[in-house]
């Protein structure tokens, strides 16, 4: 078999000619593709083109694999698969021998479809491309037992409910604003949704950022969390944007610091790797921050409130394992240190503070196969969350504005493979809510969605009112009114 090298090259794969339906599995030798440069050279721009069509009977999902080699860059090289002009990028790791690379699961529409492989940021060698009918896991087999063997009955009951709807429906959610935003009106986003759709989201997102050793104050997030669960029958989730002083070198643990001199970004002089090293100032601060958080989580536990807890989120940031792409301080020392910090927090809260009302949700990305290195492990994680922000960047349709109804199905299934279908996968944060038709047709079984507050839910450039009405009033979407918890009390 001869290979070809896809540089910045347009390669359209011939699934079938004319009007006949394509038979799957379908494999094509790369060198047999019309218009391909047979020599091992790179081709720039869209100089070489070939247009071919394939025909399928109905909308559906298909698996794409290619036999590839990549010797350009040991850090990996981006390759793009384009389905009917919609681009999806994958980082192909360095391999100097042929390997079978998973280009993900993608949707083909009823009728003719065009498939393109192109190396926008470099090239790889291709030998064969294989397309097969997609197969889907049995979502009902996801484990329902929590990682914490002492989990409260409320947490276990919530986990069992989540597992019972996983893969069948999607649960609606909405993040509340934190601090004193919206002039103190924490109901703004929720009233907006209800006034528009007649429904309330089932999940309410909170953040414990303001319970911190620096400028901490009680914004009553804990009280609202208890009210949402115990009085309104909802589900609560919470993140934790824990701040550190920007000038940590000159900070004395216990001192108050103006919020403008604090950050959760990577710009602080706080040495992340020391957070778990006993005897360091960073560790002393980290322990104090955990103690203050634990006080609030204990109040929830005492009120019999289970919580989907999502701390230390978005750690990888942009694709990396060494912390070079991190957005937050907890990720800037790299994947290995981050996993240790996660486990440290888990052990502190469950063992030292005896907190067992938590369903632990860890944010992961799917930039490359290396993204799995950020995973803390099955014994420390109950659920995986993905944060989707792609109305401007990382779109597949070439647009740079407006709602993006893409279900991000390839990412869902990549994350599912990371955890071997042992954990539920959720859209922990998002801008546009995926289109309900896309979710159903593509089997993108996200457990829940949860738009961020403010413009992400209120403005049409992120979520069109018509789209919100459609999904909130579709039987596939679970709203507050559908939850069984209040009825059972």
PLM regions: where:
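N-terminal module-boundary/linker segments of secreted carbohydrate-active enzymes
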Residues: 132-206
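Extracytoplasmic
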Residues: 19-156
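Aromatic- and acid-rich polysaccharide-binding/catalytic face
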Residues: 371-400, 450-453
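Alpha-helical scaffolding within the catalytic cores
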Residues: 184-193, 220-223, 295, 364-376, ...
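Substrate-binding cleft of extracellular glycoside hydrolase catalytic domains
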Residues: 214, 222-344, 351, 355
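Substrate-binding cleft of secreted/luminal carbohydrate-active enzymes
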Residues: 175, 423-489
């Amino acid at each position: 078999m001869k290979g070809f090298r896809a540089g910045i090259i347009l390669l359209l794969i011939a699934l079938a000619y004319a009007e006949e339906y394509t038979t799957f599995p379908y494999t094509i030798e790369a060198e047999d593709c019309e218009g391909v440069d047979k020599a091992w050279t790179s081709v720039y721009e869209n100089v070489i083109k070939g247009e071919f069509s394939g025909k399928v009977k109905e909308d559906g999902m298909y698996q794409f694999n290619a036999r590839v080699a990549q010797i350009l860059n040991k850090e990996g090289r981006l390759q793009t698969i384009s389905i009917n002009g919609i681009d999806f990028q994958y980082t192909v790791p360095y391999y100097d021998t042929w390997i079978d690379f998973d280009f993900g699961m993608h949707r083909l529409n009823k009728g003719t479809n065009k498939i393109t492989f192109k190396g926008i940021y470099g090239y790889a060698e291709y030998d064969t491309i294989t397309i097969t009918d997609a197969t889907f896991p049995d979502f009902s087999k996801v484990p329902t037992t929590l990682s914490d063997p002492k989990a409260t009955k409320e947490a276990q009951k919530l986990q069992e409910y989540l597992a019972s709807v996983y893969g069948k429906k999607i649960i609606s959610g909405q993040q509340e604003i934190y601090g004193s935003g919206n002039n103190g009106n924490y109901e703004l986003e929720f009233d907006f949704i209800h006034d528009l759709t007649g429904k309330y989201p089932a999940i309410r997102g909170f953040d414990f950022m303001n319970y911190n050793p620096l400028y901490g104050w009680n914004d009553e997030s804990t009280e609202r969390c208890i009210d949402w669960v115990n009085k309104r029958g909802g589900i609560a989730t919470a993140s934790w944007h824990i701040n550190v002083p920007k000038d940590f070198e000159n900070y004395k643990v216990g001192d108050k610091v103006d919020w403008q001199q604090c950050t959760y970004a990577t710009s602080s002089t706080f040495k992340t790797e020391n957070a778990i090293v006993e005897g360091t100032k960073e560790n002393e601060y980290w322990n104090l921050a955990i103690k203050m958080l634990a006080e609030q989580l204990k109040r929830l536990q005492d009120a019999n409130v289970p919580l989907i807890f999502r701390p230390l989120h978005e750690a990888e940031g942009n694709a990396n394992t060494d912390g070079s792409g991190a957005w937050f301080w907890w990720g800037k020392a790299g994947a290995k240190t981050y996993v240790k910090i996660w486990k440290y927090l888990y052990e502190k809260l469950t063992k030292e503070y005896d907190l067992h009302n938590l369903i632990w949700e860890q944010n992961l990305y799917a930039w490359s196969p290396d993204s799995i290195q950020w995973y803390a492990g099955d014994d420390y994680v109950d659920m995986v969350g993905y944060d989707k922000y792609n109305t401007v960047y990382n779109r597949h349709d070439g647009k740079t504005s407006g709602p993006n109804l893409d279900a991000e199905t390839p990412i869902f299934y990549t994350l599912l493979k990371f955890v071997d279908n042992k954990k539920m996968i959720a859209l922990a944060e998002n801008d546009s809510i995926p289109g309900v038709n896309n979710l159903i047709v593509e089997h993108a079984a996200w457990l829940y969605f949860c738009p961020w507050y403010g413009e992400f839910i209120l403005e049409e450039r992120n979520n069109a009112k018509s789209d919100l009405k459609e999904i909130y009033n579709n039987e596939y979407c679970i709203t507050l009114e559908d939850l069984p918890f209040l009825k059972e009390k």
